[in-house]
């Protein structure tokens, strides 16, 4: 049994303008100690899928189908009280903007103590000691005294470290990191990603890393799901996605990334067009209107199938393996990275 398994998840929001198909049949799994990267443009459904895992999208106007199995137990069928126990205890989440995630009027220590006592029957002193221990664990110096600081007295990187500490108060089995480095400068981004990796190795938890930046997952993920317009269009190991991509959307993402092995004067390629409205997604393949390789069959919805000879490498495209090989030769090094020497 997988630690977490998502089966054909659909999340549709009923609005005045129509039904928004935010997640349209996503399936994936996460094992203990693994890091899964979920990559895609803003609005592709990656955050909605993971907020649904935590039960944060439930409302009278939300239609949720499929199964979310945590060690075999279906969270979609769980009651609100049961989900409250799951949040923080089994699965924790770091949100992308720590400034808005922390309450500006309460000290960091008060917020951490509250998180500890929400799931543990401990005294306020014990909870405060645990809070100081966690701040020290995430690399904040003089942790005991910094508990009495307000969020605005922390730098952006320190606020994100405090959010990571809050997520770890109950030693969760799974940590969901939703764009954890978006609001940080490049140097601090690297520190936060390294911290998450270090904590994962120390605590043995699984990590789901949500991002629009391929560079973020390049050094951290074991597996990658590429999402587009509510659907997973390609899934595989880190090496499969970076060195042997199979879906035209993945080709476009990789081609638009600046690389140190290319001349600085070379123009980056771009994906033409705009992401579709999830109120009225295109018929068949959702990437069809932007794909330079579209043909008639693309008006039918392609399945997420294994690539021939590689069972764990899946892609949602009607192009045959031979056609993909030909297109990659024609487009040259704009698609994928050069495989490392053996």
Model-derived features with residue positions:
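A short, proline-enriched helix->beta-strand linker immediately N-terminal to the Walker B motif
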Residues: 169-173
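Conserved ABC transporter NBD signature motif
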Residues: 63-74
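Charged, flexible cofactor/metal-binding loops and thiol motifs
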Residues: 237-342
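Conserved ABC ATPase signature
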Residues: 149-154, 158
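P-loop NTP-binding/switch modules centered on Walker-like glycine-rich loops
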Residues: 41, 55, 176, 180, ...
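A short, flexible loop at the N-terminus of ABC-type nucleotide-binding domains that lies
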Residues: 3, 12-25, 56-61, 79-82, ...
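Conserved ABC ATPase "signature" region
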Residues: 73-74, 125-145, 251, 255
């Amino acid at each position: 049994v997988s630690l977490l398994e998502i089966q054909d998840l659909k999340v549709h929001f009923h609005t005045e303008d129509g039904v928004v198909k935010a997640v349209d049949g996503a399936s994936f799994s996460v094992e203990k100690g693994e890091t899964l990267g979920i990559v895609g443009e803003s609005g592709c459904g990656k955050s909605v899928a993971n907020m649904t895992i935590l039960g944060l999208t439930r409302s009278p106007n939300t239609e949720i189908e499929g199964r979310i199995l945590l060690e075999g137990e279906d969270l979609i069928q769980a009651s609100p009280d049961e989900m409250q126990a799951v949040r923080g205890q089994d699965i924790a989440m770091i949100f992308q903007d720590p400034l808005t995630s922390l309450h500006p009027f309460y000290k960091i220590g008060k917020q951490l103590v509250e998180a500890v006592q929400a799931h543990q029957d401990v005294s306020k002193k014990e909870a405060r000691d645990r809070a100081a221990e966690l701040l020290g664990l995430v690399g904040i110096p003089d942790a005991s005294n910094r508990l009495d600081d307000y969020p605005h007295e922390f730098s952006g990187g320190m606020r994100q470290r405090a959010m990571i500490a809050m997520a770890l108060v109950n030693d969760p089995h799974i940590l969901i990191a939703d764009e954890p480095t978006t609001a940080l400068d490049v140097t601090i981004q690297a520190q936060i990603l390294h911290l998450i990796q270090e904590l994962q190795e120390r605590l043995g938890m699984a990590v789901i890393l949500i991002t629009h930046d391929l560079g973020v997952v390049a050094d951290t993920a074991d597996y990658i799901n590429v999402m587009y317009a509510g659907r997973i269009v390609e899934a595989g190991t880190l090496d499969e996605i970076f060195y042997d991509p199979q879906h035209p959307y993945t080709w476009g993402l990789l081609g638009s990334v600046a690389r140190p092995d290319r001349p600085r004067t070379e123009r980056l390629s771009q994906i033409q067009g705009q992401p579709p409205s999830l109120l009225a997604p295109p018929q068949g393949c959702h990437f069809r209107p932007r794909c330079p390789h579209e043909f008639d069959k693309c008006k039918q919805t392609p399945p997420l199938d294994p690539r021939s000879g590689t069972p764990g490498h899946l892609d949602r495209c009607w192009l045959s393996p031979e056609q993909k090989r030909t297109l990659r030769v024609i487009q040259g090094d704009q698609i994928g990275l050069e495989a490392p020497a053996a």
